[in-house]
Amino acid sequence: MDALKSAGRAIIRSPSIAKQSWGGGKHKKLPENWTDTRETLLEGMLFHLKYLGMTLVEQPKGEELSATAVKRIVATAKASGKKLQKVILKVSPRGIILYDSTSNQLIENVSIYRISYCTADKMHDKVFAYIAQSQQNETLECHAFLCTKRKMAQAVTLTVAQAFKVAFEFWQVSRDKTEKREKSGSGGEGASSSQSDGSSSITSLKASASANLLDLEDCTKAFDVLNASDNHIEDLFRQNASNENNNIVWELDDGLDEAFARLAESRTNPQVLDIGLTANDLQSEECLSPSSWDKLELNPAEADELFMF
């Protein structure tokens, strides 16, 4: 945990990145500087959605599993006849935080380490859904949200996957440092080896990150640009940590550590979050630029169609 905290303290928030212009158009292909959103992710990216509901599932991941769950959630939402709750979804390497749009009241806070799957549903293509382990009883829950457009659902999915990747980097650095500290013991030997331990941790992390950047199942080719971020985690440790008031402090308790390790065993690749998007999905559709994700405007016809699922 100490290593994770020190990593967090080394991160200086970058509001200038969050305000960066990505171009005037709203519907653009995934930008070449997609990896720049990592800095924005540290502060949290906001999405304005409508909450459809939740249902329990038996497995932590799977396209067919999530599709069945979403179908059940949508049917229940339709049958209720109630107006969907407008929510703000905040995505960061910490996890997903859900707020009520009207009252700004906190609805739910889900650690990224408890999330096992997310997707843009193919049948209900405006729906984003994720599966996470409950904090109360460790059951698996599928939560679904109605987005303004299909591109929005895809954008949220990609953002959660990217947030997971950044969180995994912190988690692995923390684990590596803890293991090496335990092996080296205390005293002069431990002190003299701390610098080399940190260096080897970074080297090991860079090697795994280079090989597994946002695998997105068979979507690797669509995200080759992410290989440019191999050195990002090393850069984090070079940052000046003097501005304590602006730094993010990370904490990972034993319960979360255990949950993350357990869910990792169920993944196609333990180091990446399984998502229900393929390279064809991304290449056949234009993606929203990051600055436009929460600003998509609808024409009257689209607004009427929004509640038709």
UniProtKB/Swiss-Prot annotation:
<feature type="short sequence motif" description="[DE]-X(1,2)-F-X-X-[FL]-X-X-X-R motif">
    <location>
        <begin position="258"/>
        <end position="267"/>
    </location>
</feature>
<dbReference type="Pfam" id="PF00640">
    <property type="entry name" value="PID"/>
</dbReference>
<keyword id="KW-0443">Lipid metabolism</keyword>
<dbReference type="InterPro" id="IPR011993">
    <property type="entry name" value="PH-like_dom_sf"/>
</dbReference>
<feature type="domain" description="PID">
    <location>
        <begin position="41"/>
        <end position="195"/>
    </location>
</feature>
<keyword id="KW-0153">Cholesterol metabolism</keyword>
<comment type="subunit">
    <text>Interacts (via PID domain) with ldlr (via NPXY motif). Binds to soluble clathrin trimers and to the adapter protein complex 2 (AP-2, beta 2 subunit). Binds to phosphoinositides, which regulate clathrin bud assembly at the cell surface. Interacts with the VLDL receptor (vldlr). Interacts with the vitellogenin receptor.</text>
</comment>
<keyword id="KW-1207">Sterol metabolism</keyword>
<dbReference type="InterPro" id="IPR006020">
    <property type="entry name" value="PTB/PI_dom"/>
</dbReference>
<keyword id="KW-0065">Atherosclerosis</keyword>
<dbReference type="GO" id="GO:0008203">
    <property type="term" value="P:cholesterol metabolic process"/>
</dbReference>
<comment type="function">
    <text>Adapter protein (clathrin-associated sorting protein (CLASP)) required for efficient endocytosis of the LDL receptor (LDLR). Also involved in the vitellogenin receptor mediated endocytosis of nutrients during oogenesis.</text>
</comment>
<feature type="region of interest" description="AP-2 complex binding">
    <location>
        <begin position="250"/>
        <end position="277"/>
    </location>
</feature>
<keyword id="KW-0753">Steroid metabolism</keyword>
<feature type="region of interest" description="Disordered">
    <location>
        <begin position="179"/>
        <end position="199"/>
    </location>
</feature>
<protein>
    <recommendedName>
        <fullName>Low density lipoprotein receptor adapter protein 1-A</fullName>
    </recommendedName>
</protein>
<dbReference type="GO" id="GO:0005769">
    <property type="term" value="C:early endosome"/>
</dbReference>
<dbReference type="InterPro" id="IPR051133">
    <property type="entry name" value="Adapter_Engulfment-Domain"/>
</dbReference>
<keyword id="KW-0254">Endocytosis</keyword>
<feature type="short sequence motif" description="Clathrin box">
    <location>
        <begin position="213"/>
        <end position="217"/>
    </location>
</feature>
<dbReference type="GO" id="GO:0006897">
    <property type="term" value="P:endocytosis"/>
</dbReference>
<keyword id="KW-0963">Cytoplasm</keyword>
<keyword id="KW-0380">Hyperlipidemia</keyword>
